[in-house]
């Protein structure tokens, strides 16, 4: 045994076990997130539950069986429920949807309350923009005030839903495209007039020009408004008649319906296609109320854009600081204290950086920029409010110590003989640094970037103070000059997870979306890291011969 310990094999087994446990834990997280998030995309069967009669009236309920729990007689007594017998009972959590009718999206039932379970093939599921999912039977459709006559009503419903969604997308393109440009031009004219008033340069000629431009813009805006009104007439025309489990018919405007399907009539291939359509719809769709509607594209876009901007800022600053500390700064007590401070900054809680970013970047720098360059827009702030730029700078400051430490470690691993050889061949110190040392240290810089991206992408607390919001009317990037709007607020996957889990009006219904959002955040971080690792590997192979 002593010989076995002295051989070092126990430590090999210990390290191998640690790596295996880490990989298994990571795999378990991925499986958990993917499995729980699958409920949001995969069509679940809808049950028709016949309930015990109440005062001689037969009752029924329609919905998805969301969860089951077996309760012992002791648990029933603790819940103030009288056990029907000495046996355990099953409690079902039923997703009933139609929150505007029931007042809630879920209902809890015991097995004693249910007489029969049925799964009719003609149960229709409507995914709506408001008040949750709707379940029922398709009783008919109204075109305006008149009943719609069709030989195949379910196919007509699918066609009309797709048609209305196309009209909604066209209307949204008008509002967020041409109308947004015109509104921006109106704002430019207003600010120009206000600035001329402040500088006393508003003469009759300038006033006439501004008025003529406003008249032309108003003419174009009115024309777009007429197009939008015509689209809204077509969008609001149709209504779906949905009959619930008890026979009552409810009217649902077709514009509120995003998708419609019959889950109990689907075979495996139909369910796979539905899963793909749901995933595409969730990842590619954008609307101003994307958070509540389950559209993740704005949050994905905001997360990636913020991380890219953060990387653009933090890499030059971190590399320059590391080069100075290692190549130029003298080895004295001051530089030792600076290195200690840099290392300790990595352990500062992220919310502290958020408070600093709010006070320094937003209020001080942003407020100063508004007074110097955007005084005509005051008191409405331009950069003196949380936004994408300040969030990126705050996270760049948060991850700066990581990049400095990783780059300095890479510089320290480069042999001094390489530097001496370059100097002996006649190169200056700056040329040696630029053409020899820095290329060999690029893999270490990429390591710092990987660590910075991994930390920044998952941060939420500081972003809540410096720019992230629940939903955005427009993205930070559009086709309006200057195309990248750094002053705008943005959405982030980390904040969306928090908002869906704790601030959603229907937490239980949003739970699968929380898991799938978390899975997307993990995949984005892994994807960005893999890209950086690939670049690091290529550069390491390129400069491997220099280190020999």
Where in the sequence are the language-model features?
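Alpha-helical membrane-interface segments at transmembrane helix boundaries
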Residues: 288, 293-305, 309, 335-346, ...
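Interhelical loop and adjacent transmembrane-helix boundary motif
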Residues: 467-519
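Membrane-interfacial helix termini and adjacent extracytoplasmic/periplasmic loops
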Residues: 275-294, 353-396, 467-469, 477-483
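Transmembrane-helix boundary motif in ABC transporter permease subunits
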Residues: 310-342, 355, 363, 532-541
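Membrane-embedded alpha-helices of multi-pass transport/permease systems
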Residues: 316-321, 352-355, 390, 397-418, ...
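Transmembrane alpha-helices
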Residues: 404-408, 414-415, 429-467
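Membrane-topology segments of multi-pass transport proteins
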Residues: 1-16, 20-28, 35-291, 547-548
């Amino acid at each position: 045994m002593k010989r076995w310990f002295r051989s070092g094999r126990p430590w090999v087994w210990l390290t191998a076990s640690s790596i295996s446990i880490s990989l298994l834990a990571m795999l378990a997280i991925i499986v958990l997130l993917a499995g729980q998030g699958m409920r949001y995309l995969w069509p679940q069967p809808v049950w028709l539950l016949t309930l015990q009669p109440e005062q001689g009236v037969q009752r029924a309920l329609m919905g998805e069986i969301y969860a089951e729990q077996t309760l012992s007689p002791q648990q029933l007594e603790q819940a103030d429920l009288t056990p029907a017998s000495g046996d355990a009972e099953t409690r079902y959590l039923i997703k009933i949807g139609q929150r505007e009718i029931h007042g809630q999206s879920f209902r809890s039932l015991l097995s004693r309350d249910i007489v029969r379970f049925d799964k009719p093939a003609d149960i229709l599921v409507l995914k709506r923009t408001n008040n949750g999912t709707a379940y029922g039977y398709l009783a008919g459709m109204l075109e305006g005030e008149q009943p719609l006559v069709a030989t195949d009503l379910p196919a007509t419903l699918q066609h009309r839903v797709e048609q209305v969604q196309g009209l909604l997308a066209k209307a949204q393109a008008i509002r967020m495209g041409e109308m947004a440009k015109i509104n921006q031009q109106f704002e430019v004219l207003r600010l120009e007039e206000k600035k001329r008033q402040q500088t006393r340069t508003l003469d009759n000629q300038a006033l006439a020009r501004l008025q003529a431009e406003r008249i032309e813009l108003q003419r174009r805006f009115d024309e777009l408004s007429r197009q939008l009104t015509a689209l809204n007439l077509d969008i609001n025309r149709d209504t779906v008649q949905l009959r619930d489990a008890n026979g009552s018919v409810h009217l649902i405007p077709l514009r509120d319906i995003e998708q419609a399907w019959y889950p109990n009539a689907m075979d495996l291939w139909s369910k796979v296609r539905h899963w793909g359509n749901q995933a595409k719809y969730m990842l590619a769709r954008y609307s101003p109320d994307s958070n509540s509607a389950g559209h993740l594209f704005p949050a994905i876009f905001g997360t990636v854009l913020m991380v890219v901007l953060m990387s653009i800022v933090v890499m030059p600053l971190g590399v320059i600081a590391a080069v100075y500390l290692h190549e130029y700064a003298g080895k004295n007590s001051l530089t030792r204290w600076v290195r200690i401070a840099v290392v300790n900054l990595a352990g500062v809680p992220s919310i502290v950086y958020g408070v600093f970013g709010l006070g320094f970047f937003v209020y001080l720098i942003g407020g100063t920029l508004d007074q110097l360059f955007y005084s005509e827009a005051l008191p409405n702030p331009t950069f003196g409010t949380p936004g994408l730029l300040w969030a990126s700078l705050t996270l760049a400051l948060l991850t700066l110590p990581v990049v400095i430490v990783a780059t300095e470690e890479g510089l320290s691993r480069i042999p001094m003989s390489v530097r001496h050889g370059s100097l002996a061949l006649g190169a200056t110190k700056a040329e040696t640094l630029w053409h020899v040392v820095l290329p060999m240290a690029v893999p270490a810089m990429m390591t710092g970037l990987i660590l910075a991206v991994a930390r920044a992408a998952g941060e939420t607390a500081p972003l809540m103070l410096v720019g992230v919001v629940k939903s955005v009317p427009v993205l930070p990037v559009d086709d309006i000059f200057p195309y990248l709007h750094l002053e705008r607020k943005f959405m982030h996957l980390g904040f969306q997870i928090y908002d869906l889990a704790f601030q959603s009006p229907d937490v239980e219904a949003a739970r699968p979306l929380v898991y799938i959002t978390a899975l997307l955040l993990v995949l984005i971080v892994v994807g960005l890291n893999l890209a950086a690792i690939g670049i690091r590997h290529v550069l390491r192979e390129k400069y491997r011969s220099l280190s020999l």
